Design a protein with these regions (language model features):
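Amphipathic alpha-helical scaffolding segments comprising HEAT/armadillo-like alpha-solenoid repeats
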Residues: 10-28, 51-67, 88-100, 121-134, ...
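Eukaryote-skewed repeat-based solenoidal scaffolds used as protein-protein interaction platforms
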Residues: 100-167, 172-183
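Leucine-rich solenoid repeat scaffolds
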Residues: 256-279
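Alpha-solenoid HEAT/ARM repeat scaffold
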Residues: 38-42, 58, 77, 93, ...
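Alpha-helix N-cap/helix-start positions at coil->helix boundaries
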Residues: 32-38, 69-73, 104-108, 138-139, ...
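N-terminal alpha-helical scaffold/docking segments in eukaryotic complex subunits
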Residues: 1-77, 81-85, 249, 272-279
Length: 279
């Protein structure tokens, strides 16, 4: 490498570091947030989304962790977008780790970056996702399930692995299984998915019952209908809420009686759901 090329490379790295410092300052400025913030930040973020900026990976990962800990989804997603563009497949682990701590369900942009990485590097993606499924950390297992449902759309290859996790000791993991089996992933084995969801609707943990009951809304057979009617006696208001919605477009006096009970429920959200279903 010539002295001129070395000088040019050093100058480019210096410029990228200044751009990252500017991004830090703007992310810390509350006046930069608000309507149109994404568009205002895009030029600076795009400037950093270059493989030349890969040398900044350790600093970007530290910033990502800080924004995740601060529950700042806007800053987190800007840094994650930079990290994915600059580092490619090497950013996968950090972005998956950030997904584990998405406490505000604001991870849509982060998910889009992960989906792009999954498409570009499928072999490394499935390796990391499978490792997540086998992790001792329940949060990591949840993200592993999410990743499998994305990569194996329709459950053709990994349905059994996810289905077996319906017996996971952690209720949040079991709840994730219920919502996953209620999605298109469940077509990998519809009878088993249905059986697991029915069992999930009787799980001791309310978060599992909620997701199972919500997922059973598309099953209109008598067994499922009777189960949803029985949810009028569930002690968890969100189970009752989802049961009311899942009883939509089902005939019969027992369904009508259950909806009338939901419409008189002590919880306002349950009452509103039942009244909407009843018309």
């Amino acid at each position: 490498m010539t002295a001129g090329a070395q000088t040019d490379g050093a100058a480019e790295r210096s410029a990228l570091r200044r751009a990252l410092n500017e991004l830090d300052a703007r992310l810390a400025d509350a006046t930069e947030r608000g309507p149109g913030a994404h568009l205002r930040f895009d030029p600076l973020v795009d400037r950093l989304r270059t493989p030349v900026a890969a040398f900044l990976q350790p600093e970007l990962e530290r910033r990502l962790d800080l924004h995740v800990d601060a529950d700042d989804s806007f800053a987190r997603d800007r840094i994650a977008h930079v990290l994915a563009g600059a580092c490619g497949v090497a950013a996968l682990s950090a972005l998956l780790r950030a997904m584990e701590h998405d406490r505000n369900d604001g991870g849509d942009t982060l998910q889009l970056d992960l989906l792009a990485l999954f498409r570009a590097w499928p072999e490394e993606s499935i390796r990391l996702v499978l490792a997540g499924v086998g992790s001792d950390d329940p949060r990591t297992r949840q993200i592993g399930i999410w990743g499998l449902a994305v990569i194996d759309f329709g459950g053709a290859k990994y349905f059994e692995l996810v289905a077996d996790m319906a017996s996971d000791p952690d209720p949040q993991v079991r709840a994730k299984v219920m919502s996953t089996l209620g999605s298109i992933f469940g077509v990998g084995d519809p009878p088993r998915a249905r059986a697991i969801l029915i069992a999930g609707a009787r799980d001791p943990a309310p978060e599992v019952r909620r997701n199972a009951v919500a997922a059973l809304g598309s099953s209109h057979d008598e067994t499922v209908t009777d189960l949803l009617v029985a949810c009028a006696d569930d002690t968890d208001r969100w189970v009752r809420y989802w049961a009311a919605w899942s009883l939509s477009r089902r005939p019969g006096p027992a369904v009508r009686a259950a909806l009338e009970r939901f419409a008189a429920d002590e919880d306002g959200d349950v009452r509103d759901a039942a009244r909407a279903v009843m018309g």
